[in-house]
Amino acid sequence: MKKILSAFVIIIACSFGLHAQQPEGKFFKSFDGTKIYYEVKGEGYPVILVHGFTGTSQGWKHGSLYPALLTAGYKVVILDQRGNGLSDKPHTDAGYANDAEAKDIMGLVSSLSFKNYDVVGYSRGSIITSRLIVLDKRIHKAVMGGMGADYTNPQWPRRIHAYKALMGDTTMHDVDDMMVWIRKNNFDNLALAYQQKHQPSTSKKELAAVKIPVLLIDGTEDTTNGDVTDLQKLIPGSKMVSVPGNHNTAGNTVQFASAIIDFLK
């Protein structure tokens, strides 16, 4: 348990890294007035990439998937989820509750006039992707990377421990590494705490009703978020692919990109 939890900090910060960000895109005003930073590149069928905890849109540019999608002719949309990067960082419960992050993406899709789209999430981005495939009928195909079934538990211990630590509880030693990383990089602790407090869970009943094609993809050495085979059992017809690497490295691999390109065809 401690080993798994201590890896929390690196869930996305390393695999879809923490990178200095210069604005090259635009801002979208979401349903509650929160400004969401995004970039669009390419001319083909739209694919939205959803980063994970402490990540930003720019992390995707340092892996294999982003350039592979552009080369394959897709229109690629990357965004900073609220509380991250160049997007606004609300310090209220309302700023993150009730699927706010999924609503941001759905609103962005509407503003871009996409009739349909595919979505790829990694780690916490897969948790948001899970909400999208339940809430948004415009999704054609979805990919969830680096995620097992643990997030379906509303009382997921790791989420609760992370929230408490971010709020100042110094007894949550299983997330000490996470807190060191956050302090080192001067992240907005309160915004991150609200993200953990209101991190959505998707019920097994909701997942059982999913009708679209879903690809589950993880690293051969990744045990960070539970067993992906357990999640596959919950989503009818979902496919599962394993690629080399652990939670921090699998999402950057050529094999990760190739599996997704093949699935989206």
Predicted regions and their residues:
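Short beta-strand/loop motif that positions the catalytic acidic residue
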Residues: 210, 216-218
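Conserved alpha/beta-hydrolase
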Residues: 69-88
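The serine-hydrolase catalytic nucleophile loop
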Residues: 54-66
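Conserved loop-alpha-helix segment in the C-terminal half of the alpha/beta-hydrolase fold
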Residues: 220-245
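Conserved acidic catalytic loop of the alpha/beta-hydrolase fold
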Residues: 99-117
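Flexible "cap/lid" loop of the alpha/beta hydrolase fold
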Residues: 127-134, 138, 142-169
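Catalytic active-site module of serine/aspartate enzymes centered on a nucleophile-bearing elbow/loop
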Residues: 243-265
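Short beta-strand element of the alpha/beta-hydrolase
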Residues: 45-52
